[in-house]
């Protein structure tokens, strides 16, 4: 596909098989619970702001290694079910260690390393989806996959809020969700292994656009850095401002519900105008959302800013994945590239706020700057004639 070639309409994607959809859903429930649960638990265990940031940075480095070294091997082997089962089983074991660590460094980081096998699950599941169809159906496939992930994330946030309000440990529910992912994974079949000769022929037929691919990686990393900053520091900022921990998930929940509403419109925009222009719109939403939050600190402003941010959250994950699929050179390769590069964004989003003392709202000016940089990069790509 050239940079200007776009399907005029999005073909209907086949339905996701039930075991695969179940694995995606339960994995997303895990993500929804731990998005708030892990930072809050680390804070409650007495870890400082720097220690929490370092934990996420180390985890990001681990996830990068998994997705650049392990996942490509799994992809070439045809996404064997044994690999999916092994990696999914490591996730609940890791979270149990994190929960039991009490801040003990060795146990905490061993648990984090095991838990981060979660970063390999979506590439393995999406690789199975990509193997069943591609081309013009990509928007529909990714939108359907993303809708399942958002729904699970919403359910995870609801569970966190209910359990926290009841005085129960939400992380145990996350462990149960991770175990359910493994159960569903038993019904996810392998795909045919990639023949080396076919891989070489495919690369020759569709040469990698190196500079555009690197720019796409940078664009996704910037948008992920904004999302990581939000994921780590928004709950901590809210709690330090006097907002009860149980009142934070409703903010994220409202944003996630609006993600579902924004996703079809973003998919249509990508299909007709290209993923690069769509990501420019996504970055603009990030600029607006955190401009609101950095200037006004009320709970209402928190809700409004995250409602606006819903466009960014829905777009960078679905359209960003689509852009990498189209520039990475092969079905399923974009998913592992995505999961690797978002870890770089995780490092940026975790470390940059350390230049701000405490949980000051000036942290969110950094998010504005990162989103604005992503906006400029997307516009530069678009003006250069790249649509994808």
Annotate each predicted stretch with a short phrase:
Residues 82-96, 277-292:
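Structural signature of the two symmetry-related core transmembrane helices
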Residues 55-63, 149, 249-259, 338, ...:
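Transmembrane alpha-helical segments of major facilitator superfamily
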Residues 329-359:
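A late C-terminal transmembrane helix in Major Facilitator Superfamily
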Residues 9-60, 213-219, 223-241, 248-249:
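Helix-loop boundary and gating motifs at the non-cytosolic
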Residues 25, 105-122, 221, 301-315:
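Hydrophobic core of transmembrane alpha-helices in multi-pass small-molecule transporters
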Residues 171-189, 363-382:
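Symmetry-related core transmembrane helices of the 12-TM Major Facilitator Superfamily/SLC fold
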Residues 65-79, 164, 262-275, 357:
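Helix-to-loop junctions at the C-terminal end of transmembrane segments
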Residues 119-134, 314-329:
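Intracellular juxtamembrane helix-capping segments at the cytosolic ends
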């Amino acid at each position: 596909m050239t940079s200007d070639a776009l399907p005029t309409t999005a073909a209907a994607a086949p339905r996701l098989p039930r075991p695969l959809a179940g694995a995606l859903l339960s994995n997303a429930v895990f993500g929804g619970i731990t998005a708030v649960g892990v930072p809050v638990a680390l804070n409650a265990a007495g870890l400082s702001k720097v220690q929490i940031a370092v934990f996420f940075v180390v985890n990001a480095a681990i996830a990068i290694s998994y997705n650049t070294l392990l996942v490509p091997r799994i992809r070439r082997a045809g996404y064997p079910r044994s690999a999916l089962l092994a990696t999914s089983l490591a996730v609940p074991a890791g979270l149990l260690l994190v929960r039991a660590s009490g801040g003990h460094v060795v146990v905490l980081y061993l648990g984090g390393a095991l838990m981060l096998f979660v970063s390999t699950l979506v590439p393995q599941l999406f690789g199975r989806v990509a193997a069943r169809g591609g081309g013009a159906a990509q928007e529909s496939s990714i939108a359907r996959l993303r809708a399942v992930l958002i729904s699970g994330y919403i359910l995870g946030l609801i569970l966190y809020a209910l359990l926290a309000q009841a005085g129960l440990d939400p992380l145990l529910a996350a462990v149960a969700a991770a175990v359910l992912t493994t159960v569903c994974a038993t019904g996810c079949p392998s795909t045919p292994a990639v023949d080396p000769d076919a891989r070489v022929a495919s690369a020759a037929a569709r040469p990698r656009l190196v500079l555009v691919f690197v720019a796409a990686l940078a664009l996704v990393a910037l948008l992920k850095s904004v999302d990581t900053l939000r994921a780590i520091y928004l709950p901590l900022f809210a709690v330090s401002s006097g907002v009860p921990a149980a009142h934070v998930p409703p903010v994220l929940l409202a944003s996630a519900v609006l993600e579902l509403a924004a996703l079809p419109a973003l998919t249509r925009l990508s299909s007709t105008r290209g993923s690069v222009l769509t990501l420019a719109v996504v970055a603009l939403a990030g600029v607006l959302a955190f401009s609101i939050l950095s200037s006004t600190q009320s709970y209402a402003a928190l809700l409004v800013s995250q409602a606006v941010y819903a466009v960014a959250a829905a777009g960078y994950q679905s359209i960003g994945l689509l852009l990498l699929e189209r520039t990475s050179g092969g079905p399923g390769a974009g998913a592992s590239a995505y999961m690797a590069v978002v870890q770089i964004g995780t490092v940026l989003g975790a470390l940059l706020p350390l230049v701000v003392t405490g949980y000051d709202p000036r942290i969110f000016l950094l998010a504005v700057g990162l989103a604005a940089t992503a906006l400029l990069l997307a516009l530069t790509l678009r003006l250069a004639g790249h649509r994808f």
